[in-house]
């Protein structure tokens, strides 16, 4: 009988620990702002949607990501603004992204002239629960997006 109690106790504690694990938020590139073209490059705003699948709030402290447009890596971006995401909630994070024509000659300009683009991001974000330790999580996302070109005449 003592072995059965020990087995049940072990099973219950394992189940409780599994329920208490943190599921990482899901980050998806949601929007590419209207490109601001310059002589040596372009600037655009990249907006991400963050979903928290947990029943407690989480904080995203920072994000580092690589951006690929139509299969071409055009650079890396950073988000340093902290974002709190409510339980089962969503939040938005944005980053100003600088594209250098010299880095990927010809490709960037041809991508920027299109209305629609395949956008892929991969990177890592740093998150934590309230009062908890920071945790590093890798992510990747893909989307087919229109550039936000603002109002059309």
What kind of feature is each model-predicted range?
Residues 26-30, 35-76, 127-129, 133-138:
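Post-signal-peptide N-terminal segment of Sec-exported extracytoplasmic proteins
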Residues 53, 85-91, 115, 130:
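A short, structured loop/turn motif at beta-sheet edges
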Residues 69-105:
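Intrinsically disordered, low-complexity Pro/Gly/Ser/Thr-rich segments with frequent PxxP/GP/PP motifs
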Residues 34-36, 55, 81-83, 109-111:
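Outer-membrane beta-barrel proteins
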Residues 18-19:
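N-terminal Sec signal peptide cleavage junction
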Residues 41-45, 90-94, 118-120, 138-140:
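Intrinsic-disorder/low-complexity, polar/charged segments enriched in Ser/Thr/Lys/Arg/Asp/Glu/Gln
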Residues 1-8:
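Bacterial N-terminal signal peptides that target proteins for export
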Residues 101-153:
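Terminal connector regions
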